[in-house]
Amino acid sequence: MFRRLLIATIVGILAAFAVAGFRHAMLLLEWLFLNNDSGSLVNAATNLSPWRRLLTPALGGLAAGLLLMGWQKFTQQRPHAPTDYMEALQTDGQFDYAASLVKSLASLLVVTSGSAIGREGAMILLAALAASCFAQRFTPRQEWKLWIACGAAAGMAAAYRAPLAGSLFIAEVLFGTMMLASLGPVIISAVVALLISNLINHSDALLYSVQLSVTVQARDYALIISTGVLAGLCGPLLLTLMNACHRGFVSLKLAPPWQLALGGLIVGLLSLFTPAVWGNGYSTVQSFLTAPPLLMIIAGIFLCKLCAVLASSGSGAPGGVFTPTLFIGLAIGMLYGRSLGLWLPDGEEITLLLGLTGMATLLAATTHAPIMSTLMICEMTGEYQLLPGLLIACVIASVISRTLHRDSIYRQHTAKHS
């Protein structure tokens, strides 16, 4: 047992450095190509001329597509192992290391050029790769899947500053394939990754800063639960839209570079209306949580961002949709809150409360992982007073979504690439 805890600690350290390496590479490319040192792609887009804002995501997608197509042609005669940690965990626990690194580099290109895709997906993949590489050299084969799971949880903890949510994400998604006794090393890796990440970044701040002054009352629980019902209906719709957009891009029968470039061009066109469509949505979420906009502003940004996310994911841009899903959930919750605020008092507090609820419940509706979704929002914002209400709402959202759409976003992704 001591050996496992020691390895879990090492995996956590490796994962933290993998996440930090990707984050610093991203900041470097943003500084080189966008003259942006703020870390916010929305700020970068705002400061660019319209024509650069239009073309930058398309050029990034084109470069990533050329890289992926070139690698595919170079290795077409070789046997292929998984390049995704979910696939590796469902097979024999092995990665195609070179292809996974190329995929991460392609993700770096589309992320730094403004595509509306999550950077955290590549971070978690690199963390799992680092764990797998270490495990294959120093541990028996039957443990490889455990250490990949530890690496993925640690990467999630370092990326989102949510070690418990990262651990439970692995447990919920892999329920039935991983015994509860294995959760100990996963938690150790996640916590160590968070601590090392805090040391590297010289900060232990929460991911999102929220000023929620409301004390949750009976009325608020009713609103939270109703938001869960709404998210349970919206989750399957979002998954269906993503699947339809992917099929639409595939039906065009474009070469990968042009397909990714088209997705980037759509993001560029949308950014002419609002720069907020650039990036994974983190800075937009923070601005909404700091000062919730008016109903029509939320609606406009939501529609543009939703189209950008669908274009980016549908075109096959390598990256995650975890953080974009958080923004979509926030916007749905805030739209619901603003609408209720027309009749109820404390409209600002209701909007903020239901925005946070929307983040958790839409995440639960798309991942079918309600416990993880609840803990993630609490860990990212520090609003643990919401935990009881969010847990109920997330379970409701997950049940409704699972009833309407059998596959979660991860099962849908696996089926799409199998």
Curated annotation (Swiss-Prot):
Signal peptide, first to last residue: none
Q: Which UniProt keywords apply?
A: Cell inner membrane, Cell membrane, Chloride, Chloride channel, Ion channel, Ion transport, Membrane, Transmembrane, Transmembrane helix, Transport, Voltage-gated channel
- Name where it mostly resides: membrane
Give the Periplasmic compartment stretches of this protein.
26-53, 167-177, 243-257, 312-315, 373-379
Q: Which residues lie on this side of the membrane: Cytoplasmic?
A: 1-4, 75-145, 201-221, 279-290, 337-351, 401-418
Say if the entry is tagged with keyword Ion transport.
Answer: yes
Q: Which InterPro entries match?
A: Cl-channel_core (IPR014743), Cl-channel_volt-gated_ClcB (IPR023790), ClC (IPR001807), ClC-type_chloride_channel (IPR050368)
Instruction: Describe the family membership recorded for this protein in Swiss-Prot or TrEMBL.
Output: Belongs to the chloride channel (TC 2.A.49) family. ClcB subfamily.
Q: What's the stated role of this polypeptide?
A: Probably acts as an electrical shunt for an outwardly-directed proton pump that is linked to amino acid decarboxylation, as part of the extreme acid resistance (XAR) response.
Protein name from the UniProt record: Voltage-gated ClC-type chloride channel ClcB
